[in-house]
Amino acid sequence: MKENNLFILTSERVLDILPAINTVDLFIVDEFYKISNKKKDERVSHLNIAFYKVMLKNPQLLLLTPNIDDINQEFIEKYHLEFFKTDYSLVNQKSEKIDSSAKKCAWNKNNDQEKRQQLFELLNELTDKSEPTIVYVKSPPQAEELAKEYIKSLDIIEEKKFPIFEWIDENISDQWQLKKYLRAGIGLHNGQYPRHIVNSQLEYFNNGNLNVIFATTSLIEGVNTVAKNIVIYDMHKGNPKITYFDFNNIKGRAGRMMKYYTGNIYYFDEPPKKIDETLDIPIVEQDEELQSEILVNLETKDIKEERKSDYQKLIENLPDDLLEIFKANYFSVEKQTKLYLHLKDNPGVLNSLLWSTTTPTYEILSNTLGVINNILDGNKSTYHKALAYKCISVSHNSLKEVIVKEIESKKEFLAKKGKDKTEEEIINLSISDILSFIKNKAKYEIPKKLSVLESIVNYLSSGGKADYSSFIAILENEGVDEKISILLDYGVPSSALKKLKNLPNDNSLAYVKHNLQQFKLSEYEKTILEKAL
C-alpha cells in the first residue's frame, strides 16, 4: 500500500483493509440505497458497519443513489450532508402498457399463453427494427422457460458463433441450454452465472450480436447496456411484488450509454403505485429491526437511549475479548453466543472441530458444517451432509467434473423418487444448481460461517488450534492460487487462472502479463486475461 491510494471495494473488502488505513480523504458510496433494511439485501449489515467505521475517519463524503425523494434528517445532520435530488435524465423515456385482448381483463394464469404470444410478437417487431431489448422477468427459471419458448416460436433461427462456446464445451457441457440461446441471438442475464459469462453476454449484446436478453433482478445491479427497449414482463421479484423503487430502477436501464436518445418501456401488468421513497439509515435510526452485529459495532456515544438495554442484553456475561471477536465477525451476536455456549458445554464437539488441513475429509467437513447448520443456524435438518459433499467435490475437481457428478447424483435421486425428466432437463438443472452453489454457498456463505466457527473454537480451545483458512481460500477462490486470485474480481474464469502454473511469489501479475503466450489458454480465456491485465 502506497501513501496515496484509490480503492474500489465492496463493503466486505472495506472492513478487511480498513485497520491498515489511517486516513480517508474522500469516500464515495454508489447505490447507497442498499444501506436500507427495507431493501432486504443480505449484505446490509456489512454496508452499514463499513460506512460507520469509515466515517469515524471524517472523510469528505459523496453518496449516490437513484430514485430517492428524501433521506433521514437525523442522518443528514449527523454527517453534515446536503441532499440534492434531480429528475434530470440524458434519455427521454416512453412507456406503453401491453393489454390482453379482453381490455379490462388483467393478465393471469388463464391468459398466460396469450401474454407470452404478445411478448414474442413484440420482440419480433423490435428485432426486425434492430433495436436491442432486455426483458425483465421475476426469476431465473422463468427467464429460461421464456427463452426456450421464444426460440420455438421463431420461423428462422440464426446460427451465431461466439468465442465463449469453446469455453462452455470444455468447462460446462456442450448440451448447456445457454449455448443454444446464444446461438439464436438470445442471452440470459442471471446473477448465478460466473462473472465472465455475464460480461461476455453483455459485450455481445452491446456489439449488436445478441438481439434480446432475458434478465432477472441482477439487471438492476448497476448493469449498463445499449438496450433501447426494456420489457417488464412480470411485476414480481421472485414471489414478492416489485416496489415502485424497483420499477423505476428497471425502467432506468432503457436508452443508456449515449447510443439512443429515447428509451422505450413496455409493461404488461399494472405498475406499483407511486410513493415517496425515503431512505432509512439503520445505523442512525436504530429501530427494533436493527441487526445485533450492527449495534455492537457502534460506539457507546452513538447508541440511542432506547437501544441501550438491547445492547446490554447482548453483551452481558460476555468477556471483553470474546465480544471483540464477535464484533469482528460481523455476524448475528445472538447466534454467535448460542454457538459459544454450546461448544463451551460440549468439549467433545469442540475437540472434533480442531482441524487445520487444506483438504478435510467428508466426515470432518460434514461434522463441522453440521455444527454450523444445527447450532449456529438453528436448523434441525441434515442439509449439511449435502453441502459437505458438494464442497468436497468443488474443492477436488474441475467445474466440468463437478457438474458430471451432479448429473449422476440427480439421475439416481430422480429414479428413486420415480420422477420423469429428460436428459436435457437433468443436465441443465444440474448446471444451474452447481453454478448457484458455487456463487452463493461455496464462495460466500460457507466461508463466512466457517470463519465465525473457527474464531470461537480457538477462543475456547486451550490445547490444539483450528485453522480453516486454507480450505476457505480454496472455496472462495475456486482453487485459484491466492497470488493471482484478484483476477477473479475482474471476471477472469477460474479455469484460465488454474492453468497459470509455477508463478513467482513476487510480481505474479506482471510475470503472467509478460509470459502469457507460454500458458495453454483457449483464445476466449486469453482475451479476457489480456483485458484484465
PLM feature segments, named:
Residues 1-6, 17-18, 120-212, 227, ...:
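Conserved C-terminal RecA-like helicase domain
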Residues 7-10, 28, 59-66, 212-215:
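Structural recognition of the conserved hydrophobic beta-strand(s) that form the central parallel beta-sheet
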Residues 11-60:
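SF2 helicase catalytic motif II
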Residues 23-28, 211-236, 248, 263-268:
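A short beta-strand element within the Helicase C-terminal
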Residues 52, 58-150, 182, 187:
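Conserved interdomain linker/interface between the two RecA-like ATPase lobes of SF2 helicase motors
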Residues 55-60, 229, 236-284:
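Conserved segment of the helicase C-terminal RecA-like domain
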Residues 274-323:
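Long, hydrophobic alpha-helical segments
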Residues 306-533:
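C-terminal accessory/interaction regions of large nucleic acid-associated machines
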